[in-house]
From Swiss-Prot:
Family: Belongs to the Frog skin active peptide (FSAP) family. Septenin subfamily.
UniProt GO cellular component terms: extracellular region
Known function: May act as an antimicrobial peptide.
The UniProt record lists the keyword Secreted: yes
Location relative to the cell: Secreted
Keywords: Secreted
Name assigned to this protein: Septenin 1j
Phylogenetic classification of the source organism: Eukaryota, Metazoa, Chordata, Craniata, Vertebrata
Tissues expressing this chain: Expressed in skin glands.
Major localization class: secreted
Length: 17
C-alpha cells in the first residue's frame, strides 16, 4: 500500500492509475 506506481490510494496519498 504504497501507491507510487500502483492504482491504489494509500498512506502516500498518491493515486497513479
Amino acid at each position: 500500500t504504497d501507491a507510487v506506481a500502483d492504482g491504489e490510494h494509500a498512506i502516500s496519498g498518491v493515486v497513479d492509475s
